[in-house]
Amino acid sequence: MPIQCHDNPDADAIASGFGLYCFFRDQGKDVRLLYAGKNRVRKANLTLMVEKLGIPLKYLAHPGEEPVDGLLITVDCQFGAGNVTKIRASEIAVIDHHPLEVICTEKMRLQPNLGSCATLVWTMLQEMHYPVENNKNLGTALYYGLFMDTNQFSELSNPADMDERAGLD
């Protein structure tokens, strides 16, 4: 099951994808975390995040060559929007905190009132009783995703964002 971050992923996209990756991996699913687009991740903070937290993020240079048989989950983006390379898949799910851009599937969870997609994924993991606190690297990634997408917490306003920060602090 591939989980796709938007092209040129930021800390929030990587953290959110990693949260879903850990959940599905621990459920025994064969899961991959990937992204496509023109550029590989090169920013120092992101390469360190991926390396130090053991995030298995893979770059697809030729995404059209590997169609997905089954479900593709896009995270921190919406399939068909301008910031994500389309990977052919028989089924699409979208998890995002941005306003609706494209209606591409019935399997969408959008919460544009949140400061980060990491908050949305953290909330979903809490709903599933997934023990984020048992995975220090995942907790760190989700915390950093929220930190970066809320301008170092200066734009925290939603109670769910505040709950995530407190829960991972």
Task: Kindly label every feature range from the protein language model.
Residues 44-45, 85, 105, 156:
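Short, well-ordered secondary-structure micro-motifs
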Residues 51-107:
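Active-site cofactor/cluster-binding pocket
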Residues 1-8, 16-25, 103-169:
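A structured phosphate/pyrophosphate-recognition subdomain
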Residues 11-13, 77, 97, 150:
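Generic detector of well-ordered alpha-helical packing
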Residues 1-65:
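Anionic-ligand anchoring segments at beta-strand to alpha-helix junctions in alpha/beta enzyme folds, i.e.
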Residues 41-42, 67-69, 143, 163:
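Short secondary-structure boundary/hinge segments and terminal tails
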